[in-house]
Amino acid sequence: MHPQLHKCRQLMDAYIRQKRASPGMVQASDLQMSRPMSGMRGNSRELHAYDGPMQFIGSPHNPDQILSNNSSSVHLSSSMNSSRNNSNNLRSLSTINQEDLIEEISSHELEDEESSPVTVVENPLPPLSANSAHSQRLRNGQQSFNETLDEDDYANRNIAGVAPVRPAGIASPYKDGVAPEASNGVANGSNSGVGSAESEGDVIGSIDLFVMQPAPQGVLYKCRITRDRKGMDRGLFPIYYLHLERDYGKKIFLLGGRKRKKSKTSNYIVSCDPTDLSRNADGFCGKLRSNVFGTSFTVFDSGNKDSTESPRLDLAVIIYDTNILGFKGPRNMTVILPGMTEDDQRVKISSADPKQQGILDLWKMKNMDNIVELHNKTPVWNDETQSYVLNFHGRVTQASVKNFQLVHDSDPEYIVMQFGRTSEDVFTMDYRYPLCAMQAFAIALSSFDGKIACE
């Protein structure tokens, strides 16, 4: 070989070895990737980068190759300088864009959360319409169960001509136990047994003391009894609640009663605490107990029958006439109460005290000095409706065998108590002197109880 040619080949080999040893050799693939591709592809190609040496060698066995996951992409330009800059800034741009996107989404979510209540608060209230009372009630909030009545309770309250009653003898209520001079059982005016001449009573003092105090003379207490039959066993053992009706649909809780399950005879517990209807409760006021046939009921206070200092007192006795022949008609009931003293207090009578007789024993012996006897007012037969009717003065709206009015034989126009149905589980109960709330409620409970020999 020519010496000069051999020398040139050695120089070329040395030059090639020097170029292979140079680190700038890796950048050559960028130029190769940036060349125009075939007609089936575009002028640019999607490349993927990662945090490491910038090796873009297209070998399928390259350990540095990162498969595409469509998470981030860059387009290469035709110049080598722009390719280098895009490759070096690829990760930082992707990270910044993701952080900005997350921050922007978070800021929008926070704006939505903060702006919604502001929008609601800033919206003015709509003007009052014709139903302004309803709108005002909505703004003030719903009242609790112990303060208001359901709309269904008052649905038939003022409906005239619907009640199964017929005006019979109507007389003005009187005070001090003296009946007006009138006659023939027919009133000369618009006042009735529950007329407007009396004032409606309100709760005075604590509930536990109020329910035991006799009603003042000349005061009428309008109450409502609600029967709760919801629950597992309340179909057989419902709970009864007594409320005093007030103006504007309000009411005040007075008493609650329930029938004891484990008892040989009907036995009702009465309490002024609606959450605890038991004998051991602090609000225990008394009980109602019947005989085996359900024809006689005795009302007791909360005293202990075995105590000598404060023995249990008899508050009332309710007797239902037996109906063994099964004649259809209204119930006949007799109510015996303790007599009243000159200062309008009950005479203390205790069947638990061996030194004296109870109310029932006094009545059986016709010893009427310290007891008062009441009877249900006799209904009038109406040929048009083919039913027995009484004038409840708009307080009773549905016919029921439980409806009754209690009067004294000396003045049948002075209605001491009346009770009747207004809906399936709602009843009205009005009482006057000499009854107290406990006595009236117990009399009403006796009307609910089943009676074997009376129906």
Swiss-Prot record:
Bias type Low complexity, positions: 67-92
Domain of life: Eukaryota
Name of the protein in its database record: Protein king tubby
Localization terms from the record: Cytoplasm; Nucleus; Cell projection, Cilium membrane; Cell projection, Rhabdomere
Organism: Drosophila virilis (Fruit fly)
InterPro entries registered for this protein in UniProt: Tubby-like_C, Tubby_C, Tubby_C_CS
Family: Belongs to the TUB family.
Membrane topology category: Peripheral membrane protein
SUPFAM superfamilies, per database record: Tubby C-terminal domain-like (SSF54518)
Modified residues (Phosphoserine): S144
